[in-house]
């Protein structure tokens, strides 16, 4: 059996086994997966002469590594100038307090071996728990402040600040846009003006959402700046 066929079968099994657990997660968790989803870049803002900003590309997509449980999972990749990966994480989401989603990032086998856009997320179907690792300082929370709008800090897990502390990007996620504020002390270009991104590709399909789930990005009342 070829590796591609084996991976396809494992993905199908993962979807079948995970579907019954979709109801165990609140709508706000699924809303985050649906909201922060797709390919993004800041090319529009760069065209407005924001010379202190790098050209940044972001990929965020739902994934499923059955070894890590059946719940909502995400893959995020942030790259600069299409040459250097600034951030690459496997994410497990869970319910926090009221209107809060807990975010637990992991690194994984091969996370630092691929260039921008080169990692095949189907590989997660073949990974075991031993292929993933995390640190308590990487965990964060995002708050659903409105329908289709999330706010919070996102941990930079690839490096620490100049004083050895964990860096956190300040983030706002909308259905088709995102903004990121870069903290002082990192090796990124620091600017008081946040990085603004717009989605440039169709959203990726959700994996095992509840049968009656409706994304806030599909609702006419979503105040999320659809473009």
Q: Which positions does each model-derived feature cover?
A:
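Cleavable N-terminal signal peptides of Sec/SRP-targeted secreted and luminal proteins
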Residues: 5-22
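Calycin-type beta-barrel ligand-binding domains and close structural analogs
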Residues: 6, 23-55, 63-66, 73-227
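Conserved ATP-binding subdomain of kinase catalytic cores across diverse folds
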Residues: 59
């Amino acid at each position: 059996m070829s590796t591609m066929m084996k991976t396809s079968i494992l993905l199908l099994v993962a979807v079948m086994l995970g579907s019954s657990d979709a109801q165990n997660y609140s709508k706000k968790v699924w809303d985050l997966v649906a909201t922060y989803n797709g390919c993004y870049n800041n090319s529009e803002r760069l065209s407005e002469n924001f010379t202190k900003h790098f050209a940044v590309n972001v990929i965020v997509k739902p994934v499923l590594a059955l070894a890590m449980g059946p719940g909502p999972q995400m893959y995020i990749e942030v790259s600069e100038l299409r040459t250097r990966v600034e951030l690459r994480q496997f994410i497990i989401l869970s319910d926090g307090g009221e209107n809060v989603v807990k975010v637990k990032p992991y690194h994984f086998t091969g996370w630092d071996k691929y260039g921008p856009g080169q990692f095949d997320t189907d590989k997660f179907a073949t990974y075991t728990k031993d292929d993933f690792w995390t640190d308590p300082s990487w965990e964060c929370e995002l708050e659903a402040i409105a329908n289709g709008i999330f706010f919070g800090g996102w941990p930079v897990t690839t490096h620490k600040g100049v004083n050895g502390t964990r860096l956190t990007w300040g983030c706002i996620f909308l259905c088709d846009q995102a903004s990121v504020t870069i903290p002082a002390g990192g090796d990124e270009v620091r600017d008081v003006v946040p990085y603004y991104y717009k989605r440039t590709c169709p959203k990726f399909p959700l994996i095992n959402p509840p049968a009656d789930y409706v994304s806030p990005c599909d609702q006419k009342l979503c105040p999320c700046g659809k473009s």
